[in-house]
């Protein structure tokens, strides 16, 4: 009888801990996606202007920089 009670208690405890862990990991995945989205927004390639030394054939240069050497291959952003 004691062994049966111990087994039932153990099974209930393990089931409850799995349910709690599954709930927790689902929430973590959601927040991880938000964090990754924010990191992608701040990614170097996601900017709308070229920084010093970067090409200016796709995006215009950032404020304070000028596109120099704009031949067929495009120019490079340099200080004014």
Curated annotation (Swiss-Prot):
Keyword Zinc-finger: no
InterPro entries assigned to the protein according to its UniProt record, in alphabetical order: Conotoxin (IPR004214)
Propeptide: 23-47
Cystine residue pairs: 49-62, 56-67, 61-77
Signal peptide per UniProt: 1-22
UniProt modified residues of type 4-hydroxyproline: 60, 63
Tissues in which the UniProt entry reports expression: Expressed by the venom duct.
Keywords, comma-separated and alphabetical: Disulfide bond, Hydroxylation, Ion channel impairing toxin, Knottin, Secreted, Signal, Toxin
GO molecular function: ion channel inhibitor activity; toxin activity
Annotated localization: Secreted
Family: Belongs to the conotoxin O1 superfamily.
Described purpose of this protein according to its UniProt entry: Ion channel inhibitor that inhibits the increase in intracellular calcium upon depolarization in DRG neurons. In vivo, both intraperitoneal and intracranial injections into mice induce hyperactivity.
UniProt-recorded name of the protein: Conotoxin Vi6.2
Annotated organism of origin: Conus virgo (Virgin cone)
């Amino acid at each position: 009888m004691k062994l049966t009670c111990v087994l039932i208690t153990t099974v209930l405890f393990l089931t409850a801990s799995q349910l709690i862990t599954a709930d927790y990991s689902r929430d973590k995945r959601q927040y991880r996606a938000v964090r990754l989205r924010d990191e992608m927004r701040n990614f170097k390639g996601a900017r709308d202007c070229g920084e010093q030394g970067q090409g200016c054939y796709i995006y215009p240069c950032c404020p304070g920089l000028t596109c120099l050497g704009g031949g067929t291959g495009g120019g490079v952003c340099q200080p004014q």
